[in-house]
């Protein structure tokens, strides 16, 4: 079940080791409303297609072509791809480490979870929002938003990703270690 946990970022607290959430909700309408108040998009779609184990990117993109085209058109995104992570993926440790570091992008980060789950952590001013996205969730993180992503130590997800550029995922790391103070997906 999708979940939103809102924490103070701890920057004004003497004890930054164990933050206490200000709000925790698993109600989709409340998640959507809280994120929207902060400029983050959140939708839930029916993830009707069961992915065969051997489904490749072209199969995934074809299965969700109508939804992909709508988001691409509405957001002006130039390219789209699909990423599928499994517990035995050879780059899972390196990718998790990279994604766990706080960073920004020059473009929106838009993801639709076809299967599995991932934790988007958004550092917005004096708040940190941990947004657990699961199958059927679409999240739009605006360009320039400080955030990190946790796919877990044994990742098992597939997400469609939209981009404004042909290069794909390009991050600018902030150097802030804030992600180390907050719960992870595991």
From Swiss-Prot:
PANTHER family: ACIREDUCTONE DIOXYGENASE. Catalyzes 2 different reactions between oxygen and the acireductone 1,2-dihydroxy-3-keto-5-methylthiopentene (DHK-MTPene) depending upon the metal bound in the active site. Fe-containing acireductone dioxygenase (Fe-ARD) produces formate and 2-keto-4-methylthiobutyrate (KMTB), the alpha-ketoacid precursor of methionine in the methionine recycle pathway. Ni-containing acireductone dioxygenase (Ni-ARD) produces methylthiopropionate, carbon monoxide and formate, and does not lie on the methionine recycle pathway. Pfam families: ARD. Monomer. Residues 10-20 have a biased composition (Polar residues). The record marks 108 as: May play a role in transmitting local conformational changes. This is Acireductone dioxygenase. Binds 1 Fe(2+) cation per monomer. Belongs to the acireductone dioxygenase (ARD) family.
